[in-house]
């Protein structure tokens, strides 16, 4: 299939003026080889301290990825320290995806699937602009998003709520609006996960996952999505630890294991397919290089230079920065990394920085004063927009028993069976269903947590609510309704309430829990466990507000059994 019929002419996403071009060339030409090597790295921080930053800044990295804790002042101080210590301004990056990984001092917004469930591009744009503006207040220049994977394999724990859904046309429409809004507000967007995830239910944090499509199928789906968004000017793409064997074998028919090479170290996927066929002229960043999909493929000393040599311009994260810096330098000396690729990558890195205006910002002015930051975060307008999106996203999947709306007169005594899920990142928002219980009590309900030693009965319970809240999460392998944990033991996991007591399943995470609970007659998908969503869900359960969410995926997992 020819891509010419699918994609607009590629644009130059990193176009800069002559003054900026001169800065790029002057800065690059003044660098030593060691300084150029440093520019290839984006190191990660999570402690917001000068002590943590010191060894990283000594390597003069091109970027710093921020996973903040909950102290805005410490976060700002660490950013200022990094800026002050740098000769070449570092780019600040982040996984800015919403949901329960929203930053603690920023406005809490639904995750990407929650935004898609609003089924309204104006809402998508409003949330994207809100996120971009607050990200700029926090000093972020580059968001590692949005995810443009197609959520086809419902058992995948890593795509799910991080995606815009399973329908390619919706993914493209939503991502187009989201990227335009981010970049118009001064934040570089990033398409991920190249060459496309969502058809393998495994997680590249643990294994090299596989895009199983034929070449023609890929062109019609991911080729169209990436081609269109590249044509619209997205600045960066994240090359992931995902194999695309059909494309490799189209060029190397006898490929064996090499057909399953991660894109991160694949010249064919990064250079030939992404750059030459799709015409991408922006920056390619690797996915996190500590993930199992890459660490399981080849030895680290070979991996480090191979990532850059095979088409990535920046190397994301390191558990041993000094060691990996040494591996990159050794790779240049022993020929695993060519001078041409080093020169090309550093030029593109500096061009991205110039495109974002970092070359002309006074370091003393890059981070606004702390009080100004506080005033610009969680503004009333932003809170209203986020609350509206939170409510708009909540989706009634089914209510075949006509349980809703709930009322204290009929369902006063409520047993709560809850699993809060976990966060990959220590600084993520705290989890808990306290707001749900508070909202129920305020309306006259009497909620109590399940006592696994005293099973609810018709005589003492009017309603059972299952509250589950695991969003798509790295390294989770699979997300499912864990009845052993919910009910307290393997034996009790076999007991079910749905046919004895009115029961409802409320998901504040993945939208596929019905697969493990086909006999649940009432199901609501709310996509994230942030406080506005928790409170707005109760309003919809009681009929105070309508369910308006439109599921971006098939919550019935293609199984007729789940519909009844």
Model segments located where?
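Short acidic, glycine-rich surface-loop motifs adjacent to enzyme active sites
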Residues: 6, 55-69, 73, 154, ...
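Active-site-adjacent structural elements in enzyme catalytic domains
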Residues: 71-89, 121-137, 347, 351
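Conserved, mostly hydrophobic/aromatic
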Residues: 32, 64, 95, 120, ...
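Glycine-rich tight-turn/loop motif centered on a GG-T
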Residues: 62-69, 108-123, 155-174, 203-220, ...
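Hydrophobic faces of well-ordered beta-strands that scaffold small-molecule active sites
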Residues: 37-45, 62-66, 90-98, 142-146, ...
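Second-shell residues forming the walls of enzyme active-site clefts
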Residues: 74-85, 90, 100-101, 166-341
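Preference for extracellular/luminal or secreted protein segments
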Residues: 1-60, 266, 276, 296-564
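Short, acidic/polar
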Residues: 44-57, 124-134, 218-228, 298-304
